[in-house]
Amino acid sequence: MKFFKYILTLLVVFLISGYFLLQNHSVQNRLFENTVRALFQTDEIFMNDALSVAVCGSRAPLPSPNRAETCLLVQAGTSKFIIDTGRGSADNLQRWRVDYSDLEAVILSHLHSDHISDLHEVQFQSWLGGRKTPLSVIGPIGTASTAQGFEQAFKLDSIYRSEHHGAILPIEAYGYDVVEFEGDAKLIFENEDTRIIAFKVDHSPVDPSYAFKIEYKDRSIVVSGDTVSLDVMVEYSKGVDVLFHDALAKPLIQEMEKISEEIGNNIVSKVLFDIQDYHANTVEVADIARRAEVDLLVFYHLIPAPRNYISEQMFLRGVDEIFTNYHVSEDGTLVSLPAGSDEILIDLID
């Protein structure tokens, strides 16, 4: 009993001392200084000499806590790309303190809002991060007019900020430098070690819509964008290290559709019915991975994103019978493929 009282007394003294210590201005300043240093310092999240992908947005438009809409941050050696910029993804990039100095381009798969909503935020963050020329954007036909719309919407904002901050935000660096592509397949980027091929997929009525094959030295990935199940996905994914594929979980969506109809929310019920015909479902995606003999399948653009154990089990219903080496992504999932190796490393960015 005496020992318990002694420990309790020490705890009370410690808490009181800590409280008064935190009222000290010097202590407050030091703690805040440490926070600010961590906030403003760029952080390197990628391995050297590797093909790496960080999932900066893992969900579809259906809301889910702690998840942004579709976005992948790709590092191929010393070159960086952002594939799609859905709502909330720029916040993740900012929170991870991404260094934009080696950003080659933003690449857009198609022009649905959940793939482009944060394009301006990425443009602004990289401008604030020291970019000296307009942001390079590569995308399908229609990308130029979309970028022009963003540029016009924030034109006055850019002028105000440039006039206020001067040379650190040169007005000539504001905006977008757009390259559009078309056709069934197109080489959209190439340097000594890296190739990116865009190939057409089916997300009708969205047309065009593209997937991407990215090769860095001896490593490779395919990113589906949004598509139904297609043989062309198998063709381009044949033997790649990792396939990142959008996926719709029919057991979840059909249950949500039924409940929406029962409670009289006919608009939501209709939308949930409609989306089932232009996304591959989880079982179909697993079959694509099996037929292509990929080493790892990563589900992203999750429709809907699982929120708990039960919904994840429903999301994956039928998948294990077809393909077992898969990973259900979350915001911060990091997949690294070191060059000259067969390793596939999976981590989570804090």
Spans of model-derived segments:
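Cap/insert and terminal regions of metallo-dependent hydrolase folds
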Residues: K2-G18, A211, S220-V222, V228-D331
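Binuclear metal-dependent hydrolase catalytic cores
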Residues: K2-V228, S311-D342, D347
